[in-house]
Amino acid sequence: MEGDDLFDEFGNLIGVDPFDSDEEESVLDEQEQYQTNTFEGSGNNNEIESRQLTSLGSKKELGISLEHPYGKEVEVLMETKNTQSPQTPLVEPVTERTKLQEHTIFTQLKKNIPKTRYNRDYMLSMANIPERIINVGVIGPLHSGKTSLMDLLVIDSHKRIPDMSKNVELGWKPLRYLDNLKQEIDRGLSIKLNGSTLLCTDLESKSRMINFLDAPGHVNFMDETAVALAASDLVLIVIDVVEGVTFVVEQLIKQSIKNNVAMCFVINKLDRLILDLKLPPMDAYLKLNHIIANINSFTKGNVFSPIDNNIIFASTKLGFTFTIKEFVSYYYAHSIPSSKIDDFTTRLWGSVYYHKGNFRTKPFENVEKYPTFVEFILIPLYKIFSYALSMEKDKLKNLLRSNFRVNLSQEALQYDPQPFLKHVLQLIFRQQTGLVDAITRCYQPFELFDNKTAHLSIPGKSTPEGTLWAHVLKTVDYGGAEWSLVRIYSGLLKRGDTVRILDTSQSESRQKRQLHDISKTETSNEDEDEDDETPSCEVEEIGLLGGRYVYPVHEAHKGQIVLIKGISSAYIKSATLYSVKSKEDMKQLKFFKPLDYITEAVFKIVLQPLLPRELPKLLDALNKISKYYPGVIIKVEESGEHVILGNGELYMDCLLYDLRASYAKIEIKISDPLTVFSESCSNESFASIPVSNSISRLGEENLPGLSISVAAEPMDSKMIQDLSRNTLGKGQNCLDIDGIMDNPRKLSKILRTEYGWDSLASRNVWSFYNGNVLINDTLPDEISPELLSKYKEQIIQGFYWAVKEGPLAEEPIYGVQYKLLSISVPSDVNIDVMKSQIIPLMKKACYVGLLTAIPILLEPIYEVDITVHAPLLPIVEELMKKRRGSRIYKTIKVAGTPLLEVRGQVPVIESAGFETDLRLSTNGLGMCQLYFWHKIWRKVPGDVLDKDAFIPKLKPAPINSLSRDFVMKTRRRKGISTGGFMSNDGPTLEKYISAELYAQLRENGLVP
């Protein structure tokens, strides 16, 4: 074409630089200026000249010139040196956390808090009456419906929920209002403890202020459940009706009894009996009866029955709960005289039959009759399900109108079957008044209060009435802000008050010092000094739990569970909050013990930042993680590595997500999953070897000095099992491990009768610590008891040091019985100087005792609970065989279902990926949970002291070399062995005794 010569091969105009945009703009500006001057005439030039003159005049007025370009009022300084430190940033970073909307769904502003159907001021006025306050924990296995149960209560209490969509209203999607973390919503399970304070009404229209705490159901988060148990007066244990009483439910019942907490049971998911299992009414009754019988087999004499109003039936998916008492009041109250309602209610459970106005405990002859529960409750319920799902609306209308006095709207008749069924059931059962009524009947405020405080606090004192005394349970990240969850046991707490905070890790030592029999003057001075050392904090804010909001209040009363801001920096895990008016009150104050988190953290990872310069961010984030996850343990090894100990894979996965995405916001390198080990022995010490602090290794004579001799032997397995449960003995002879040394006579009797100890050893027990025991086996002829008592505290402290970190790999010692055989103390040495030397020498003597008793390495064993369809059992067995040391010890058929409950054991170090393998192999039809409740430890195969054990490179170690392999790898990771990757400088007795003595032992064949 003719115009092709004007453009090059790339479409650019020839002769013009395509990148010279300035030239193009200048050409356009000149053209526009020319056109403007041409068409507007010369008048425009006069305007420009006048503007220029005006601007020059204004500059002169302001004093702007070449000498003063910014005016005479502006001083220009020329600096040649830095006035700011190079370490000071030009822009200060934000030190406070932002609201972190990206990881939480939360209502921040008070004006946006959803309104309730009741008057909140009336609820707050009820806080002045402790008897009208109930603290309820909602606990149960995974996916049993705890959070959905809380949704029903939240919906009943609020006028409008901000996050409630149409699908949620119709029942297609769960609300899960108490899951306010996006991680919880994405994973589909609760991770953190949450709660809500509500005003609830029972069947008698009496109102109560109830603080509900919703605990996670996954066993990895059992530490959160432990916090809920510590805070609650009563627990609702929610059970999936299909799975029944699993091993998790058994453990929750035992923990509730141990914590002196009253119990109610919610048998949830009744819809699954009808729609999933398709059981006929009689079979459904037998299934429910079987579950309740299993519950009563674990409750130690406390009888639970639907007619006692402590068993609630529910289907949280369909939005209803009911008790037998409530069902009768809705369905039969209009046809039965009020005087006979209670009598009729008591006959609606068990082997009771009805025919023509008569009740019998045996079936009627020649009459096909069902038990009363089936006839009067299940059959009407089945009819409602049948009519609603089959859309037989005329029959359903008649049934509802004649029996429940309920009318259906035209809009409801247009619903799909499932939303329609939910709507009908909610019309019948209305609000959750039956559930609230059961809670109020089970709650016994005065009996429970004393038992609970006695269990949670250190024995020996009684806090004065009226003194502010509260239990700080944990630190929570609530809506991006840091709050403390606190239960108040006595006194009044107001915003702006100054309070004292004592960490529970210091409670025992503090209380012991106050109980010492010393003079009044010394006691008052000591108490005053100690009180000055206790951190004091100002209460900045007080709030009530709301699920996805915090409702601010000005004060909190006895019995309440509240959130407090401003005190979290004064403690780590939990604490005692108090404020005393006098020194006498201070002497009587009780302190709370550290919480028992049920399980022990044995799942281990090592991590470090990807970029070393980001280490401060990691350290700050780890401090937050340590506070927000109650059961986590964070340590720093000598090698500089940061170690995190948690409860399992899911626990670690959630923790690391928070660490990366919410708190540190950096990239992190982590190790493969590891575990902790324990050190023990398998035999008695072969010799009594004294350990001295004045050993000569150069041939000169030994100087007289301090020497200690300790022997070790394995503890009885029965005693180890009892100590793992923090008790000794059984029944009335049972002693709690925390106060075990306070009653030496009873302890001696238990050791003789229950464990077969001789009288001398049982009377001379000095200490129990971390599953180990120290016994004084010295002879009065060799050392006087008076002299020994002077150094008893230091000897026990040295024993504590030894069992915390053993000689093999600095892992805790477990299951060892130490005996103090002899101690030699020079008479011409100052006592205070001698005390400082006894502690490390006693630690060394315990190491020698262990190394002379055939030391072994113990590994933790997970118990695994698998729910799987029966035909898939061979797959489970095959998966267990592939894991070293795994075994199945029990298989239980779940009654009325095609499911099996498989119980087994698998070593923690072999458990990584087991759940994933199970889910993939069974196509999602198998579910497992791994836990370390019973604290089972098993010997690792091999000899830890065998230097010649074969350990190949880049290959799994042989079974007989595992013990040595684990010890050496642990020592290298901790920096104990510094000889490189293939170093073999393992534990040895030679390190702790003289070279001459070691050579003699070697000649006699006592050491390798």
From Swiss-Prot:
UniProt GO BP: generation of catalytic spliceosome for first transesterification step; mRNA splicing, via spliceosome; spliceosomal snRNP assembly; spliceosomal tri-snRNP complex assembly; spliceosome conformational change to release U4 (or U4atac) and U1 (or U11)
InterPro entries, per database record: EFG_III/V, EFG_V-like, EFTUD2_N, P-loop_NTPase, Ribosomal_Su5_D2-typ_SF, Ribsml_uS5_D2-typ_fold_subgr, Snu114_GTP-bd, T_Tr_GTP-bd_dom
Record-annotated residues binding GTP?
140-147, 214-218, 268-271
Region G4: start-end pairs: 268-271
Cross-referenced Pfam families: EFG_C, EFG_IV, EFTUD2, GTP_EFTU
Keywords, comma-separated and alphabetical = GTP-binding, mRNA processing, mRNA splicing, Nucleotide-binding, Nucleus, Phosphoprotein
**G5: annotated span:** 315-317
For the region G3, what residue ranges are annotated? 214-217
Q: Where in the cell is it found?
A: Nucleus
Give the protein's biological function: Component of the U5 snRNP complex required for pre-mRNA splicing. Binds GTP.
Self-association state and partner proteins as the record states: Belongs to the CWC complex (or CEF1-associated complex), a spliceosome sub-complex reminiscent of a late-stage spliceosome composed of the U2, U5 and U6 snRNAs and at least BUD13, BUD31, BRR2, CDC40, CEF1, CLF1, CUS1, CWC2, CWC15, CWC21, CWC22, CWC23, CWC24, CWC25, CWC27, ECM2, HSH155, IST3, ISY1, LEA1, MSL1, NTC20, PRP8, PRP9, PRP11, PRP19, PRP21, PRP22, PRP45, PRP46, SLU7, SMB1, SMD1, SMD2, SMD3, SMX2, SMX3, SNT309, SNU114, SPP2, SYF1, SYF2, RSE1 and YJU2.
What name does this protein carry? Pre-mRNA-splicing factor SNU114
Q: Which organism is it from?
A: Saccharomyces cerevisiae (strain ATCC 204508 / S288c)
